[in-house]
């Protein structure tokens, strides 16, 4: 008698899905690709990349760059082509406040005493991936 494998129960599917590991891994990978695209875009413009995924306590800054005398704190967002919501629209007031808080702490701890650095600004970067895999990058300086 040949036995077939039992069908996955709704419970086991829910348990696997609720862990979110595959979805979370995919989001992290997409986020890393978006940050790669932003860093490449900035480097091509002669902007110095100071740090990626900079931790400030429990807060994180996606990209820290030096644009002449300015330290740019950059929040990176991504969406697929054809998304109904623009990537930049996903930076809500709460996220802006967290990024500002992280940037201000980083400024006090690191950049306030660096020669040649005059100020800090908060930029937003939107990365859209086309079906071909090509990325388009839009950076809004002093976005918030």
UniProtKB/Swiss-Prot annotation:
One of its GO terms (molecular function) is nucleic acid binding. Signal peptide: none annotated. Gene3D superfamilies: 3.40.1350.10. PANTHER family: UPF0102 PROTEIN YRAN (PTHR34039:SF1). HAMAP family: UPF0102. Belongs to the UPF0102 family. This is UPF0102 protein sce2912. It comes from Sorangium cellulosum (strain So ce56) (Polyangium cellulosum (strain So ce56)). The lineage of its organism: Bacteria, Pseudomonadati, Myxococcota, Polyangia, Polyangiales.
């Amino acid at each position: 008698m040949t036995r077939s494998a039992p069908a996955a129960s709704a419970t086991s599917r829910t348990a696997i899905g609720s862990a979110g590991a595959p979805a979370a891994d995919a989001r992290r990978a997409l986020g890393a690709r978006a940050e790669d695209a932003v860093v490449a875009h900035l480097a091509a413009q002669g902007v110095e990349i100071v740090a990626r995924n900079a931790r400030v306590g429990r807060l994180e800054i996606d990209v820290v760059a030096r644009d002449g005398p300015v330290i740019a704190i950059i929040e990176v967002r991504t969406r697929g082509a054809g998304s109904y919501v623009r990537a930049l629209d996903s930076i809500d007031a709460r996220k802006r406040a967290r990024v500002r808080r992280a940037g201000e702490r980083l400024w006090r701890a690191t950049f306030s005493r660096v020669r040649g650095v005059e100020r800090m600004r908060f930029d937003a970067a939107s990365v859209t991936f086309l079906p071909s895999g090509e990325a388009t990058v839009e950076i809004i300086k002093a976005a918030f």
